[in-house]
Swiss-Prot record:
Domain of life where this protein originates: Eukaryota
Disordered as annotated region, ranges: 1-37, 165-196
Location within or outside the cell: Mitochondrion outer membrane; Vacuole membrane; Preautophagosomal structure membrane
Assigned protein family: Belongs to the ATG32 family.
Biased composition (Low complexity): 24-36
TM annotation in the entry: 396-416
Biased composition (Polar residues): 165-183
Membrane-topology annotation of the record: Single-pass membrane protein
Protein name: Autophagy-related protein 32
GO CC annotation: mitochondrial outer membrane; phagophore assembly site membrane; vacuolar membrane
Lineage, opening ranks: Eukaryota, Fungi, Dikarya, Ascomycota, Saccharomycotina
Keyword Transmembrane helix assigned: yes
Main location: mitochondrion
Length: 524
């Protein structure tokens, strides 16, 4: 063991610092750190230390003798008392217990450098290995000092540590192969240049009190992560906003005429003053054209600066037709998108309709749902329609009703025409009677022979009902004869043959006529 080895943060030739100090601060912190570690409830292996020491007594005694020799050589220069020596030997047992049980679990801490890492406080270690879990799904940023990502498993962290060793700002290799220099940076400028040099041959692989401290810090590193959402203020939510532009003061005057209810949708600006980044925040541009001749120039200039955009054109009185034609030309070339057709600024009715349409869009976009909800009107009590009768729903009801009505009308007409004919025939028969019959009728009318009238008049009600029944019977017979005459006149065999055509006629006309006659009989 050579006594020329460098110590933590000490300049060449100055060996007044402690070699086994657990903190980069004062020399008296070693006892407190070791006692806190020995009696800490976070150390699960303190209770089994005696069992492990019994099995590893041989190896422990040999290492203890070497450490005692090293301490005796540097005891005078470093002013190490016996309490620190006992504390170090007891911590040495804790180190062996850790290495015997959970060495593989924290192997990634020593994968880059086989040397031990000394004099790192808890804040410095978290600065090197700390990380933040974020709910953002964007691409992960490169961690400072190539810290392992907390989203990786233990095996993936080990592979990442081997592939990308820590940079020189955290742990760097300096000097020859026998000596390794570890640099740690903290917020204090006084302690920013702390370095430590230890020989691999002096400390050995996987031994030393400082390795136990690193393992304990690994526990705190594993439990120090917290979840914080990653908020981005560069890209805020795009809302419904319209920028009013004009080449004069028309935009300000138009904005001042609006009510406070509608001013929330608009901002005022001048042509070509808004940058391209600011223009992306607006839904559309409302341009007030003072002259129809400048429409093409203004739109070309804005298209070259902002690209395709949404336009709400406002024109002056008498220029609506020319502005409409020029705006449609740009819309057909896919340079602009029209939110509305040109509106005359002096027409209050058109301006009011435009503002009402824009406000409905503003409310719809701001609330993220459709505002036009169909209203359900309750039917009035008196507005209920009466259900149609069951017979009216049948298609065959109306044809039959019409046929019966026409038939009854024909029957009544035929009856009255027949009654007029019978009365005319009876009057002619009376004229042709004999003279004695005429005299008898005249006497009966004058009242000279009432017996004749009594015989001709009905004697009782039964005789009257008989005459009525006879009249109904005669009427039915006459209607039957009328129907037969009508059907025979319109549905004759010759008529059927003529309607079919000349091609229906055959050389054997008798058989054809007999078949058609049989068909007529079936129908009748």
């Amino acid at each position: 063991m050579s006594g020329s080895k460098g110590v933590w943060g000490a300049p060449p030739g100055n060996n007044n610092r402690q070699l086994y100090s657990l903190d980069a601060g004062s020399s008296g912190s070693g006892v407190s750190a070791s006692s806190a570690q020995r009696h800490s409830i976070l150390d699960p292996h303190d209770s089994v230390m005696d069992l492990l020491n019994g099995q590893q007594s041989c190896a422990f005694d040999s290492r203890l003798i070497q450490n005692q020799d090293l301490i005796d050589r540097k005891g005078k220069s470093n002013n190490i008392d016996h309490n620190d020596i006992n504390t170090h030997t007891h911590s040495k047992g804790l180190t062996d217990s850790w290495q015997a049980i959970d060495r593989d679990e924290y192997s990634f801490l020593n994968a880059g450098n086989h040397n031990n890492y000394h004099n790192t406080s808890n804040g410095d270690f978290n600065q090197q290995f700390g990380g933040v879990l974020s709910s953002d799904t964007s691409e992960e940023e490169v961690e400072i000092n190539a810290a392992p990502s907390p989203n990786l498993s233990a095996s993936q962290q080990h592979n990442q540590f081997l592939a990308y060793p820590l940079s020189s700002t955290g742990f760097g290799d300096q000097g020859n192969s026998e000596t390794t220099v570890h640099q740690f940076s903290d917020g204090d400028p006084v302690k920013s240049t702390k370095t430590g040099q230890f020989s691999k041959a002096e400390l050995g692989a996987g031994t030393g009190e400082d390795e136990t401290i690193m393992v304990n810090l690994g526990h705190s590193w594993a439990g120090s992560f917290f979840v914080m959402p990653k908020l981005s203020l560069s890209e805020s939510m795009k809302r419904f906003k319209i920028l009013i532009l004009s080449d004069g003061d028309s935009a300000n005057s138009f904005y001042n005429r609006l009510s406070r209810y509608h001013r929330l949708m608009f901002d005022v600006g001048k042509l070509n003053e808004a940058s391209k980044e600011e223009a992306l925040k607006y839904t559309a541009f409302m341009i007030i054209f003072s002259d129809s001749k400048k429409v093409t120039t203004i739109l070309n200039r804005m298209w070259k600066k902002y690209g395709d955009f949404t336009l709400i054109p406002i024109c002056q009185k008498g220029q609506k037709q020319s502005v409409t034609e020029k705006v449609k030309t740009f819309a057909n070339s896919n340079k602009i998108k029209l939110m509305s057709y040109p509106v005359v600024i002096s027409d209050h009715y058109e301006i009011h309709g435009l503002l009402r349409h824009l406000h409905s869009l503003y409310v719809e976009v701001d609330s993220d749902y459709e505002t036009d909800i169909p209203k359900k009107t309750k039917p009035r009590k008196g507005a209920k329609k009466k259900p149609a009768p069951h017979l009216a729903k049948r298609w065959w009801f109306w044809p039959i009703s019409i046929a019966l009505g026409v038939g009854i009308g024909c029957c009544v007409t035929f009856y009255f025409s027949k009654f007029e004919t019978s009365s005319y025939n009876s009057s002619v028969g009376v004229i042709q009677t004999a003279d004695k019959e005429i005299d008898a009728i005249v006497d009966a009318i004058e009242g000279n022979s009432p017996s004749i009238l009594e015989e001709s008049s009905p004697q009782s009600i039964s005789d009257f009902l008989g005459q009525v029944c006879k009249l109904v019977k005669d009427t039915a017979i006459q209607i039957n004869e009328l129907l037969k005459q009508f059907l025979s006149a319109h549905l004759m065999t010759s008529a059927w043959i003529q309607s079919i055509g000349k091609e229906f006629m055959q050389p054997d006309s008798q058989s054809t006529i007999s078949k058609v006659t049989a068909l007529d009989l079936v129908m009748f």
